[in-house]
Swiss-Prot record:
This is Thymidylate synthase. The gene is thyA. GO terms for cellular component: cytosol. Catalyzes the reductive methylation of 2'-deoxyuridine-5'-monophosphate (dUMP) to 2'-deoxythymidine-5'-monophosphate (dTMP) while utilizing 5,10-methylenetetrahydrofolate (mTHF) as the methyl donor and reductant in the reaction, yielding dihydrofolate (DHF) as a by-product. This enzymatic reaction provides an intracellular de novo source of dTMP, an essential precursor for DNA biosynthesis. Belongs to the thymidylate synthase family. Bacterial-type ThyA subfamily. InterPro entries: Thymidate_synth/dCMP_Mease, Thymidate_synth/dCMP_Mease_dom, Thymidate_synth/dCMP_Mease_sf, Thymidylate_synthase, Thymidylate_synthase_AS. The keyword Methyltransferase applies. It is an enzyme of class 2 (transferase). Gene3D superfamilies: Thymidylate synthase/dCMP hydroxymethylase domain. GO terms for biological process: dTMP biosynthetic process; dTTP biosynthetic process; methylation. DUMP binds at R141, R142, R181, S182, N183, D184, N192, H222, V223, Y224. It catalyses: dUMP + (6R)-5,10-methylene-5,6,7,8-tetrahydrofolate = 7,8-dihydrofolate + dTMP. It comes from the Bacteria. It comes from Bacillus subtilis subsp. natto.
Length: 279
């Protein structure tokens, strides 16, 4: 049993047993298959904590880990909102939210790429500012990136689910706290928790720090009603030992990472389970 499997199953059980239904509301989300309202059971404010002795990834079903890393590179490295850039990597998870101009509007990578921070008399973006400050001002309590920009929310295809990171440097270790306003526990959570842990490992490597703690906070923590039956099946499955994530140690520049610099070794997992997408 991995740290992730244990915490994940605990949250799923809590939602199924104690979650509050939103069936009294006219919800925004619709089932992609038939256009009917996609309702949820939810609880508020859940936290997952990992000591980074193992990579946090689900083993009761397969997580598309390469796709998760490619999306991470698209947002954090390319700082792109162009879905075509993601398609070139063989990833199509954002196709349903693509606007006429081929982008997802002013969301995700668009916000990270804005040159809105001042550094040595120049304007830089949030990622470059973070990398500089972690190296040169490690004791700061202001190591924060933010994707939730009220000025741009109406211009986004989808407002960000994971919207904030806060980084801490203590005793030579880089700790990361992530905040998600909302998490679909069947599809989004295993993806997001893994990919932001990969981000922590990447940034620790290029800034020269050891890995510290990894914390993932969820505001609206929910399960879609059509996902409940398969989640019950998933929770009863055999759990495996955590795999090892290899990251090419030769990469010292954040912008030089490619998907070929990552390997997930001995990833044992349950069979794929299908969960319908709500849009």
């Amino acid at each position: 049993m991995t740290q992730f499997d244990k915490q994940y199953n605990s949250i799923i059980k809590d939602i199924i047993n104690n979650g509050i239904s939103d069936e009294e509301f006219d919800v925004r989300t619709k089932w992609d298959s038939d256009g009917t309202p996609a309702h949820t059971l939810s609880v508020m404010s859940k936290q997952m904590r990992f000591d980074n002795s193992e990579v946090p990834i689900l083993t009761t079903k397969k997580v598309a880990w390469k796709t998760a890393i490619k999306e991470l590179l698209w947002i954090w490295q390319l700082k792109s909102n162009d879905v075509n850039d993601l398609n070139k990597m063989g990833v199509h998870i954002w196709d349903q939210w693509k606007q006429e101009d081929g982008t997802i509007g002013h969301a995700y990578g668009f916000q990270l790429g804005k040159k809105n921070r001042s550094l040595n008399g120049e304007k830089v973006d949030q990622v470059d500012y973070l990398l500089h400050q972690l190296k040169n001002n490690p004791s700061s309590r202001r190591h924060i990136t933010m994707l939730w920009n009220p000025d741009d929310l109406d211009a986004m295809s989808l407002t960000p689910c994971v919207y904030e990171t806060q980084w801490y440097v203590k005793h030579g270790k880089l700790h990361l706290e992530v905040r998600a306003r909302s998490n679909d526990m069947a599809l989004g959570n295993p993806f997001n928790v893994f990919q932001y842990n990969v981000l922590q490992r990447m940034i620790a490597q290029v800034t020269g720090y050891e890995l510290g703690e990894y914390i993932f906070n969820i505001g609206d923590c929910h399960v879609y009603t059509r996902h409940i039956d398969n989640l019950k099946i998933q929770m009863e499955r055999e759990q495996f030992e955590a795999p090892e994530l290899w990251i090419n140690p030769e990469v010292k520049d954040f912008y030089n990472f490619t998907i070929d610099d990552f390997k997930l070794i001995n990833y044992k997992h349950g069979d794929k389970l299908l969960f319908e997408v709500a849009v």
